[in-house]
Amino acid sequence: MDLKKILPKNGPPINEVSKYIEKYKNDLIVIKYGGNVFIDRKIFDNFITDISILNKLGISFAVVHGGGPRIKRELDKSNIQSKFIRGLRVTDEKIINIVESVLIDFNNDIVDSLKKFGTDAVSIHTKKNNIIKVTPEAKELGFVGIPNKIDNNLICLLYTSPSPRD
């Protein structure tokens, strides 16, 4: 692989990159992408470019993302005032539908943007393939829960497949 063709001109030295490719080539890297980053499209586009480069270098990854600011904006648009108990947002059915919709939109934006760069990407979310099992935190919190099991079969299947598909 010719790293000079893949790496940005202002990127790190090739010998540094080679060292990390070798170190992580058999691992699945989990990247947490906060919802605040979605506010600035330029930062988002840079993130997509960087992830696409990792993919071209043979690094496997999973992106876990948030959506806090957009969730708040959508709740405000719907005139929904959030209530908090012990620092946790009380989440009724109306709120969970908005949260889910925002997060799925972000998820699709990430996947579609990666595909435009030639990166195989698959969307995993609650409406399609809910892999996270939770225990409700407390009845008064509504849909707030504690993750207690992640069914990683789908993740493992995608990680070992040569070309993931939706």
Each language-model region and where it sits:
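N-terminal glycine-/serine-/threonine-rich phosphate-binding loop
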Residues: 1-62
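Electropositive phosphate-/nucleotide-binding environments in soluble metabolic enzymes
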Residues: 4-15, 41-48, 65, 89, ...
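Short beta-strand segments at enzyme active-site cores
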Residues: 30-32, 61-67, 71-73, 121-125, ...
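Short, active-site-adjacent cap segments at secondary-structure transitions
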Residues: 37-39, 69-72, 129-133
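Glycine-rich loop at the start of a catalytic domain that most often binds anionic cofactors/ligands
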Residues: 42-49, 73-81
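Ligand-binding beta-strand-loop-alpha-helix segment within the catalytic cores
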Residues: 76-158
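Conserved small/polar residues in nucleotide/adenosyl-binding loops
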Residues: 159-166
